[in-house]
Amino acid sequence: MNIILLGPPGAGKGTQAKILQDRYGVAQIATGDMLRAEVKAGTELGRAAKAVMESGALVSDEIIIGMLRNRLSQPDCRNGFILDGFPRTVPQAEALDTMLAEQKFDLDAVILLKVDEAVLVERISGRFTCAHCGAGYHDKFHPTGVPGVCDKCGSHDFVRRPDDKAEVVKDRLVAYNAQTAPILPYYEQKGRLHVVDGMAAMDQVTAEIEGALRRAGVAAPATA
């Protein structure tokens, strides 16, 4: 099972990738996490990425693809992988296809989580976390049991990410649509794109993803 999960910020890609990882024993690969791990480990690619980031520039596709190549060689990818939110552009998609072919990986399916933009703004702008233990909450969908008190540790201190503000979220969605929209026909022409309603309940979204994978002929890996 080698798949890509696409969708705008707040569509639930990370949540669904984690569910599929736990259920089928495949590796969830989020490029941001991978990049931070490489930088922290001080690998050759990590050092190159750190130098680029410290200069204020964007890490090149070549570096990201190189990191992905290394990541896919690790044992937890033996049953397959889920790429969470990558690629974002057609050049990235083309470079990814080339690298996967070189490494003898077949890309089975690309799942697009489609969510209404007004819902996305509400989902993202309502998020907050406990400043003490990091537990995540939402004003509407997952409030604390007792207002102002963390369910897990009892702290009264909470934080919100600056880029979760409604106006910032709207700007991120504009950027996503401008940058990522062209890769949808790229994968559709290859017969790999499958659209799933990301506005349903979490379990229903998972079921729809699994249904799309079955229709695509993707066999679930055997789990120990």
UniProtKB/Swiss-Prot annotation:
InterPro entries: Adenyl_kin_sub, Adenylat/UMP-CMP_kin, Adenylat_kinase_CS, Adenylate_kinase_lid-dom, ADK_active_lid_dom_sf, P-loop_NTPase. Its EC number is 2.7.4.3. GO terms for cellular component: cytoplasm. Consists of three domains, a large central CORE domain and two small peripheral domains, NMPbind and LID, which undergo movements during catalysis. The LID domain closes over the site of phosphoryl transfer upon ATP binding. Assembling and dissambling the active center during each catalytic cycle provides an effective means to prevent ATP hydrolysis. Some bacteria have evolved a zinc-coordinating structure that stabilizes the LID domain. Monomer. The keyword Aminoacyl-tRNA synthetase does not apply. Zn(2+) binds at residues 130, 133, 150, 153. It comes from Acidiphilium cryptum (strain JF-5). It is an enzyme of class 2 (transferase). It comes from the Bacteria. Pathway: Purine metabolism; AMP biosynthesis via salvage pathway; AMP from ADP: step 1/1. Residues 126-164 are annotated as: LID. It catalyses: AMP + ATP = 2 ADP. GO terms for molecular function: adenylate kinase activity; ATP binding; zinc ion binding. Disulfide bonds: none annotated. Belongs to the adenylate kinase family. Gene3D superfamilies: P-loop containing nucleotide triphosphate hydrolases. Its main location: cytoplasm. AMP binds at residues 31, 36, 57-59, 85-88, 92, 161, 172. This is Adenylate kinase.
